Amino acid sequence: PEGMNVQLKVVAWYVGRVGQNFDGGNPNTSAYTLFNGVNIINYDYDWDGLAYICYYSTDDPANHPDIKVHFMNGQVNGYLSPDKTNEEMHEMCVNAPNSHMDLVGSKVHSVWSSEGLAQYCKASDGTSLGYIQYMNLLDSLVAWEHDLIGLTKYNRLPDNRTMAYVNYTYYMFQGGMGVSFHVDQESRVLNCQRLMYNDFDAIWGLSHEWGHQHQMAPWLNWAG
């Protein structure tokens, strides 16, 4: 809209360091303000990133028009979503220009390594491609949390999404952006069969860390 701006954030999810005890690399975010017209972006960070347009409002989003942003150059990484086939999404992961890939479900936006998704994202039968089922599984976990804390009952469901992402520094935690698992855990947390039937710690971890993210001080806030 005239007189307004939006943020372009380029996130390098991998920055060249892998650790195990908060001694690895954290995602690096480079932010740029976009205005109407031509914007020149000089991204000079050492590692490639994925670009996100941040268009938020504190009032009713319906009061704000849609915007269009056109990138003159740069590679298209794409994102996985339930409207694509499992075969299409597998091809995207195998041929991804970036080392990481976004998955956008109805309630969860997650980011994992492209290699891990191509290798480990299997359905509950253990062999079929599992991208659609995996996104539905994550969405179900968040929907159940919304039921548990009363957001569904009192018609307070948020219109945005919660987050999950891969990290290179610690086993499992709830970071500033959402639930995070170490890259060496992708064989567990990307596999629907393991999450649903064989690995209660992994599926508990997702739900537990999202529980922290859903804490709303001072009304719902617990320690530990």
Feature-to-residue mapping (PLM):
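A short linear-motif detector with a strong N-terminal bias
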Residues: 30-33, 81-82, 89-91, 142-143
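Low-complexity, Pro/Ser/Thr- and charge-rich linker/hinge segments at domain boundaries
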Residues: 68-102
